[in-house]
Amino acid sequence: MRNVLSVILGGGKGTRLFPLTQYRSKPAVPLAGKYRIIDIPISNCLNSGMNRIYLLTQFNSVSLHRHIRQTYRFDRFDGGFVEILAAQQTMEGETWYQGTADAVRKNLNNLRDKNIDYYLILSGDQLYRMDYRELLETHQKTGADVTIAAIPVTREAARGFGIMRVDDSGRVLGFLEKPQTDKEIDELVRTDPAWIDARGIESKGRDCLGNMGIYLFNRDVLIDLLMKSDYQDFGKEVFPMSIRTHNVQAHLFDGYWEDIGTVRSFYEANLELTRPDAPFKLENQEAPVFTHARFLPPTRLDGVHVKSSLISDGCVIGEGAVIENSVVGHRCKIGKNVRISNSILMGADFYQSAEELAE
């Protein structure tokens, strides 16, 4: 898959995820105790055989840069890389990124590789597992200029999505951002559930196709769309316009997918991972989630009751502690007889002595 270049968008200010984003960007926020959110799209790329990856960053990016530098190091011979493109002022432009599309436009000089046929545009703040080779297969079989990943959703959920309308071949004909009424859905973007069922996915009452924010562009198509316009955002501007001018196809996806854009969604997604029947399985040998190896000691437990929880490395948990339905991050020290439930402990970057904690 050396002809595919992946571009991961590092996200904006992350105001809806504040205070978790007070000192770090959204993709750098910890996930499931030991990972960072950015590990998800990067792992998806690597598991799909796509190892040429650029990460576009701007806000609070020091922690994210450090994580990428320490984690993703490839040998010199396979041509793979995960490289950071930080926002910068240049002779051509003195403004910062104004949106997702503008971020890619400002980096086209770095992205214009002659050996690249496709650009895969990804968000850096989503939790899901996808084989992008299937997306590429849909793109090539349909002769698409642009292919977008689409997830079937209910009408209630559609109010939080950009919803697309497709014809029988899967070509996208219309798009509506966050429809608020059944009338809007019926008249503009409803998808026949039978069409979804016919493609091997059970519709289960879902008659809307939501935009997942995952786009595959032909190389020249993306460059042309960005250079001949001043569009700032992929979802709100580039994608709707490309529907009118190019062959845009939908690629159906029916796995677990969560946009971790708010404190509530972050909390709920983490706690879902602690369940025995978690909808997203971290323990997947065929498609593992990669992250930084910290070489911490095993967690020490002493007469502890643990139920439906994730405990990271390097923790010390005192006798009689009870931990239920919770995530415990790296290097946490939990005292005797402490009870923790339905909680997320973010962990620590270093150990503190008893004297330091008392100060």
Residue spans of the language-model regions?
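A structural signal for short hydrophobic beta-strand segments in well-ordered beta-sheet cores
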Residues: 28, 163-166, 250
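A secondary-structure boundary/capping signal
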Residues: 9, 122-123, 218, 253
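Left-handed beta-helix
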Residues: 1-5, 194-205, 219-359
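Proline-centered turn/helix-capping motifs that create local helix->coil transitions or kinks
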Residues: 72-80, 168-174, 181-186, 275-282
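Conserved core of the sugar-phosphate nucleotidyltransferase
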Residues: 129-216, 229
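Active-site glycine-centered loops adjacent to acidic/histidine catalytic or metal-binding residues
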Residues: 12, 125, 262
